[in-house]
């Protein structure tokens, strides 16, 4: 709703009850930088807020708005079907780690940041699931806390209290296994816990007491990835899905590990040129007998 209220304020529009023309202008504004589905999400938020404020919005009578949404969907086509963000793969993770630990940050903060990054990657976490909304305040009912982490000898569990696909906050426990590599999330978490002074509040916090936020992760990834373009916090989740697919993991496993409610995870997977080359080579050298007939529908 903040986006909507700011938009109305900037253009001197009445926010409640919203007219069809106001919603058309707002939808056009959102569509200029986001997807059709996100436009619908923003409009749903406006509708919900209006109902709370006892303002009824006759969406079914807003025919021009309906036609606009159809037009946005058609005009975007598949141009937004693949996120533009670069996936962070294990090779890029190692570059990020090297640059992070060679930076001038406090050692305790480096260890904390690395623990957060590896946990996010191997846990397929969304940014909201492991960061705090603000630097100095948090909501204990939604923020990942220190007591949501359980460390064992060769594994760790992280309890996520709420997420995008868990609107009723049933919660889910993410299992991390030690992998005996330089990217091991369990080792990173154990190293972080060994030097962290407190055991309360958000799991990931800086030495000065401030909490790790989405903006922090975005800035850190951009500054440690050797100038890689289109890096963001979501690049970790995209990279995890792409890496799992490249390793040949079945789609049901990728969907389960990432907690996707549908097969939309496929749009996160990036297929490298090397993979396409190997597939092309394999197809060209495969000695399959010539079939007597071919049915493309079979």
Where are these regions (language model features)?
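Extended, non-catalytic subsegments within catalytic or DNA/protein-binding/adaptor domains
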Residues: 1-298
């Amino acid at each position: 709703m903040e986006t909507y209220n700011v938009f109305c304020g900037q253009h001197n529009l009445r926010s409640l009850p919203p007219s069809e023309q106001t919603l058309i202008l707002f939808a056009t504004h959102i569509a200029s930088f986001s997807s059709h589905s996100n436009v619908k999400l923003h409009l749903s938020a406006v509708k919900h807020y209006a109902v709370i404020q006892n303002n009824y919005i006759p969406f079914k009578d807003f025919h021009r708005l309906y036609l606009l949404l159809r037009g946005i969907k058609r005009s975007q086509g598949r141009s937004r079907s693949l996120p533009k963000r670069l996936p962070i793969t294990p090779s890029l993770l190692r570059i990020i780690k090297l640059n992070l630990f060679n930076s001038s940050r406090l050692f305790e903060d480096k260890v904390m940041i690395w623990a957060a990054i590896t946990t996010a990657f191997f846990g397929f976490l969304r940014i909201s699931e492991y960061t705090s909304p603000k630097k100095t305040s948090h909501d204990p009912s939604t923020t990942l806390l220190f007591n949501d982490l359980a460390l064992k000898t060769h594994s760790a569990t992280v309890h996520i209290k709420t997420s995008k696909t868990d609107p009723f906050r049933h919660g889910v426990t993410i299992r991390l296994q030690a992998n005996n590599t330089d990217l091991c999330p369990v080792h990173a978490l154990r190293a972080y816990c060994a030097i962290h002074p407190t055991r309360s509040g958000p799991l990931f916090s800086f030495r000065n007491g401030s909490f790790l936020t989405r903006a922090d992760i975005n800035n850190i990834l951009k500054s440690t990835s050797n100038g890689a373009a289109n890096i963001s916090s979501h690049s970790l989740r995209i990279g995890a899905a792409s890496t799992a697919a490249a390793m040949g993991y079945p789609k049901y496993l990728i969907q389960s590990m990432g907690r996707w409610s549908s097969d939309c995870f496929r749009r996160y997977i990036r297929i490298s040129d090397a993979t396409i080359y190997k597939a092309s080579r394999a197809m060209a050298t495969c000695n399959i007998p010539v079939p007597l007939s071919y049915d493309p529908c079979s």
